[in-house]
């Protein structure tokens, strides 16, 4: 089960559009994608409402886990999305 702590770096944080992109990428994979602001308080990364409720602004550290089939591929895709500013430019 891959796990990473990663910083939200885009200017608007994990707002509605960014959360929708995150959930869209997570949904492409059959594995579970728990994510949260603390390692013991994880939510379903495939739920738009759960991801938006994290209220993760710019600079927030999030704990990202993947477990199951294609978990490494899912982790790589989600980390790439976050590191590419959710394809929003900054």
Curated annotation (Swiss-Prot):
SUPFAM superfamilies: HPr-like. Residues 1-89 form the HPr domain. CDD domains: PTS-HPr_like (cd00367). Its main location: cytoplasm. GO terms for cellular component: cytoplasm. GO terms for biological process: phosphoenolpyruvate-dependent sugar phosphotransferase system. Disulfide bonds: none annotated. The active site is at 15 (pros-phosphohistidine intermediate). Belongs to the HPr family. This is Phosphocarrier protein HPr. It comes from Pseudomonas putida.
């Amino acid at each position: 089960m891959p796990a990473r702590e990663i910083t939200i770096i885009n200017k608007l944080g994990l707002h509605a559009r960014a959360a929708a992109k995150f959930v869209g990428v997570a949904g492409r994979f059959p594995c579970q994608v728990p994510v949260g602001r603390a390692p013991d308080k994880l939510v379903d990364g495939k739920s738009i409402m759960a991801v938006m409720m994290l209220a993760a602004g710019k600079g927030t550290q999030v704990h990202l886990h993947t477990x199951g089939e294609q978990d490494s591929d899912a982790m790589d895709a989600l980390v790439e999305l976050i590191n590419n500013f959710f394809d929003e430019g900054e």
